[in-house]
A protein has these predicted regions:
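Nucleic-acid substrate recognition interfaces
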Residues: 1-209
Length: 212
């Protein structure tokens, strides 16, 4: 069973810079791919650029390489979901004259997938991988030499199988997070005072969300 938990963590200025840059890169990648979908004919593409095409075609692009590979792919996938929703609404008439996905003016959240997250059972710390190009940029531009991001919160101790971590743009030394994690059964729920509701959420599948 998948659950989600929203929380926040305090971060150092160096971490704020790194996370902020990733959120900026994600918004730029979204806009590049969105422009391509809006204007694929003018760009000379033979067919409409779907997620499978875009995640490969932009793999060497600047903004893609400033993100962990799976995070960049997930950004492209979220755009793909937005376009699919637009076409469904257009076909079914669910909304009169629906608008296609918009370009992002501000930084957007980034999603770490399981392979980019290191978590020891019972630990209150997560270790997140950073892409090589981003590390080089941070070193050369800001003198920041972080190899990984380490986020700490006591709620991580009870999460044995973390599947995704959605990180929001930092503000005032804090960063909001949504943690998607797996539990093996429902018996644990009777002890934690949580209730459940269906939430399509920020992930690519329907999951159960836990609220305090």
């Amino acid at each position: 069973m998948l659950l989600s938990h929203r929380t926040s963590v305090k971060i150092r200025p160096e971490y704020s810079n790194i996370i902020g840059h990733m959120c900026y890169a994600a918004s730029k990648l979204w806009n590049v791919c969105n422009y391509e979908r809006h204007h694929y004919k003018e760009l000379g593409l033979e067919k409409y650029p779907d997620w499978y095409y875009q995640k490969k075609a932009h793999k060497g692009d600047l903004w893609y390489r400033q993100l962990p590979s799976q995070t960049a792919q997930e950004t492209c996938k979220q755009l793909d979901k937005a376009w699919k929703s637009f076409y469904v609404l257009k076909k079914t008439g669910g909304i009169k004259e629906p608008n296609p996905p918009r370009f992002k003016q501000d930084n957007i959240p980034v999603t770490y997938m399981q392979m980019g997250i290191r978590h020891e059972k019972g630990s209150d710390q997560l270790r997140l991988s950073l892409p090589r190009d981003l590390k080089s940029y941070m070193e050369e531009t800001y003198g920041i030499h972080e190899r990984f991001l380490y986020l700490e919160n006591k709620i991580f101790r009870d999460m044995d199988h973390i599947k995704q971590l959605r990180i929001y743009p930092p503000e005032n030394g804090k960063c909001d997070l949504i943690v998607i994690y797996e539990i093996e059964g429902t018996e644990q729920l009777s002890q934690n005072g949580h209730y459940l509701s269906i939430d399509p959420g920020p992930v690519s599948y329907t999951h159960l969300r836990a609220h305090e």
